[in-house]
């Protein structure tokens, strides 16, 4: 887990923004440390993907959590895939098509990450 204080928030609109704490988590083993950190600080928390579809404030007096879960695991031969939340959505679509795993290729070119897909309501794009 990496913790940065007074860190810039990158976003697709290139709005200048920063936050009090920016925390990168690399794997699920760091969740306990993250929980302790959040509990001790008693600040609002926001989970950030790639910074698309957000309009950040000039300064966020809280904790930004940036998951760095960039893994793709093929679990068996019947097209079951486990995907990390930080994977870019369009990259995932291209990767699945390249592996002959079909079904959501019409959802290509949508900005954001896999973890943000439910919040961004990606399914509303026609699938």
Describe the role of every protein-language-model region.
Residues 1-125:
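Anion-binding (especially nucleotide phosphate/pyrophosphate-binding) glycine-rich loop
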